[in-house]
Design a protein with these regions (language model features):
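Acidic/histidine-rich helix-loop elements
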Residues: 17-34, 55-56, 84-91, 182-195, ...
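Conserved beta-sheet core of the metallophosphoesterase superfamily
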Residues: 154-235
Length: 241
């Protein structure tokens, strides 16, 4: 992920981005989550970030805590399925709050030192985002040399003032989950979120770089088609955006 004005010390910084576990409902996604966590432990990145929709049923909360507790340092935000804003009739909110030792950010910020530089993480709560009350740029610290916003919804990118953050990490979209390939290069019909502007991958807007995770789990139906689950390692580089 190339970033303009990235301090030399932060070049090569590795961030593992995970999203949309949807644990609690039997599916191949649960296996993907287990494998992704094992892989993340093995690659030992500088930072692990999880961008919401952790559970589809509360019964998986103990296992979720075990998985997140094995990742250090780990920062988390909630998604709509975690706070009862899901249309999936099989989903039930677990009312998650504290996830220690993982750090859950609920409309709050935390600054840490990585490689001798100040890195700020700001987390958006899905409840305030959906009601339009969220103003994450007001939490941004202009003295931080790298500002990272965590939000379940990738559409947050449209709301951000230019250059308020360097990086946005989001999920929610499942890369369509079930898609139909078209006889054109890199073209598909996304059955989930068919008009999505940000389905998965890298985007740039107003000087801000965003990665949208395809996620690992599933909702409504326990399968994916032409929308593979993914755990992503992002490596920051100096360069033009």
């Amino acid at each position: 992920m190339p970033l303009a004005a990235l301090p030399p010390e932060l070049a090569g910084l590795r961030i593992v981005h995970l999203s949309d576990f949807h644990l609690g409902i039997p599916s191949r996604g649960a296996v993907a989550v287990e494998r992704a966590i094992e892989w993340a432990r093995r690659v030992a990145p500088d930072l692990v970030v999880v961008t919401g929709d952790l559970l589809s049923r509360p019964r998986a909360e103990p296992r979720l805590r075990e998985l997140l507790g094995s990742l250090r340092p780990c920062y988390v935000v909630l998604g709509n399925h975690d706070v009862e804003h899901a249309r999936d009739p099989f989903s039930r909110s677990a009312g998650l709050s504290d996830l220690s030792p993982a750090r859950l950010l609920v409309d709050e910020a935390e600054t840490l030192e990585l490689r001798g530089r100040r890195v700020q993480l700001v987390g958006v709560d899905p409840r305030s985002y959906r009601t339009g009350r969220s103003r994450p740029w007001l939490l941004a610290d202009p003295t931080a040399e790298l500002r990272i916003l965590l939000c379940h919804y990738p559409t947050v990118l449209r709301r951000l003032p230019a250059d308020s953050f360097h990086v946005v990490l989001a999920g929610h979209m499942h890369d369509g989950q079930i898609t139909l390939p078209l006889p054109l290069p890199r073209r598909r019909v996304l059955l989930a979120h068919p008009r999505a502007a940000y389905a998965s991958g890298l985007y740039v807007r107003n000087g801000i770089s965003m990665h949208v995770s395809p996620g690992l789990g599933t909702t409504f139906v326990p399968l994916r088609f032409y929308a593979r689950p993914e755990a992503t390692e992002l490596v920051l580089e100096r360069g033009r955006r």
